Amino acid sequence: MMKKLISLLLSAVLAVSLLACGASAKTLSASTLRIAGLKGPTTMGLVNLLAMEKNGTAALDYDLQLYGAADEIVPKLIKGELDMAAIPANLAATLYQKTNGGIQVLAVNTLGVLYVVETGNTVHSFADLKGRTILSTGKGTTPEYVLRYLLKKNGLDPDKDVKIEYYSEASEVTAQMAATKKDAIAVLPQPYVTAAQMKDSSLRVVLDLTKEWNKVCDTQLITGVTVVRTAYAEDHPDVVQAFLTDYEKSVKAANTDIDGTAALCEQVGVVAKAAIAKKALPQCNIVYRRGEEMKKDISAYLQVLYDASPAAVGGKLPDDNFYWVKPTTTQQVQHKVKKLFQ
């Protein structure tokens, strides 16, 4: 009798879910999606969500929160004060291990955006970095591990041949460069490279770390990914899917509507001036990669980091559950049955 009842319930819920296919996620979940990003390229792909919400074309309501450093986002994500976040790829892997699968990756959002810059004219190759001090942001995340990996690949010991000074935010690095003035060397991401060059015309890009990565590695250099709390994804698979639809449109707008996106970047606080974003956006490698392509790119990138330093990805490589895919019909039905009994 119980099996028959459950079967009837599942059938009923499936029918309801099929009828609701055309409904918006706003109908399915009244809560606002809380998503965080860093002041940089990973958030530049998110800002058009706000424009979409304002003009009524977004499937969801968004609370986009901006932070200067990844370590400000992590505790909020763990505590459930955020639903999603755009964070460095290796940090996502580390959090997955630390939270026992508490987060999942939804998409790759940014490829390589890192550059070595200097205010002098002394660096023309990695060999010229020997004995020098390098200013950088991102300790424990993409900038640190990419820089160390490339230094080693170019015959330099990052612990002996150079001195790396880390700062919490890229804006602190640019401020320190300005204070040092002569022959300062730094690793900076876009749009901070552009912002710094607009203030100081003597600043020059000496190494494009994406190009340098491609010389020694056959995997994609991935700067950022978008993650979701696993519990949230399990409770709201329909909302996650609706977000991804909106997000894909937002990324497309970031790459096609440069003026509009630049204005939003200033409005949100990603950059100080829209002019900076307008000049930097074409160099920010903002992407939307999902599914098998996402999994292939991330897993290959994490393998490179793991081989160089297991600590970079949390001690071990994440399993397949690290990657969120579109929920099956059964999962959607189970979700709706769960809601019926709450």
Regions found by a protein language model. Name each.
Residues 1-32, 331-342:
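Short, low-complexity disordered leader/linker segments with a strong preference
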Residues 26-161, 165-166, 190, 206:
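Short, glycine-/small- and polar/acidic-enriched structural segments
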Residues 48-50, 114-125, 220-239, 287-290:
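A bilobed periplasmic-binding-protein/Venus flytrap-type ligand-binding module shared by bacterial periplasmic
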Residues 53-60, 211-219, 286-295:
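Short, solvent-exposed loop/beta-turn-alpha elements that line the ligand-binding surface or hinge
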Residues 90-91, 172-264:
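Pocket-lining segment of extracytoplasmic ligand-binding domains
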Residues 108-118, 204-232, 282-283, 320-321, ...:
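Periplasmic-binding protein-like
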Residues 233-312:
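Secondary-structure end/capping motifs
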Residues 299, 303-342:
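Conserved C-terminal helix/tail region of periplasmic/extracytoplasmic solute-binding proteins
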